[in-house]
């Protein structure tokens, strides 16, 4: 068996897969080294071109090109370093295992000739290095890559402060936040002022056409719209899925075992609240009545009271188990809801700039529609929330929410909510139409009232 393993190791060592496997760290480091050379060349050429007069005219286009090259080079450098470290770690562990195995065979007393001819000490030590690559060369390349990364950060700072900010601030009144934790560090959003943006944009475009700068602002406008849409979609996806995923993972891994152990061992009660106990009593009465009805219909005279009591006892134990699990589920629902709300609040608090971008993007989509479509969507939303048939929907929502937190259906609570909450929504909507929409676009208000009538 040992000779068979040695033969397999000899064949693996002489195969092309083995050479490819041992050369993986060197290939990864070489890719990162080539990408760092590209960054250093861009840094040298950027300093040379910046002093030319043509840079003032084509500076923004040059910055766009530099950004694309830097993004690609940065990805290659970081991915190559990650692959280098991971493969180096795996190869080190693997070579240590092979060296221990070879050393154990060398110290055997029988003197295995097959092993002595194929695996000597010098060949075993070769497994601890990276395919004839010295540490001095590796350290020199790593130092070069580190210097290239420093140049890359300097290039990003220089290219981000040249032409896009003054153009957009002067022509479109756009703010560019520079510290967003996203795929792009420069995500733009437009501020909303008292004057409608359609008027300011029309005036800005007129000035741009007169000054002959229409070509130079097409790319900034496209880049602004692209970053705005990308950041808004990412933020909306995070707001929807991240709290749900985080609370579900916490529920499965941590909360469910802890709550089940606590409720089954530390608590003597079965019911979470009084409504569960009342529902269990009503269910038990129904089961007992159905059992007596079956006995009367079947006309079984030999049915003893002890058998009836035993069946009722078994049904009671089943109900206890059902409501015990329901109590655990209710506690889990409350905890997961609290975790989801906390996660959502953290996202809204830490992502204020993203929220401003998302708000601006939604307003851009809304104001880009025609007046008829705007009035249609407003009518659709109001009819769903405060329309004639909306109380039935609110009753279903409140009933499901009460069942979710472990309470029974209470018609007084539902009636109180349905009679007050839609009225508050109607008041807020009318205030928004009167105060904001009437000032921004009076034609929408006229179309809305016409369609509503």
Curated annotation (Swiss-Prot):
Matches recorded under InterPro entries: CemA
Alphabetical list of Pfam families matching this protein: CemA
Entry GO terms, CC: chloroplast inner membrane
Membrane topology note: Multi-pass membrane protein
Main location: plastid
Subcellular location: Plastid, Chloroplast inner membrane
GO MF terms held by the record: antiporter activity; proton transmembrane transporter activity
Keyword Transmembrane helix: yes
Chain segments annotated as transmembrane: 235-255, 328-348, 378-398, 414-434
Reaction catalysis annotation: K(+)(in) + H(+)(out) = K(+)(out) + H(+)(in)
Any one Gene Ontology BP term: potassium ion transport
Keywords: Antiport, Chloroplast, Hydrogen ion transport, Ion transport, Membrane, Plastid, Plastid inner membrane, Potassium, Potassium transport, Transmembrane, Transmembrane helix, Transport
Role: Contributes to K(+)/H(+) antiport activity by supporting proton efflux to control proton extrusion and homeostasis in chloroplasts in a light-dependent manner to modulate photosynthesis. Prevents excessive induction of non-photochemical quenching (NPQ) under continuous-light conditions. Indirectly promotes efficient inorganic carbon uptake into chloroplasts.
Similarity-based family: Belongs to the CemA family.
Protein name: Potassium/proton antiporter CemA
Species this chain originates from: Zygnema circumcarinatum
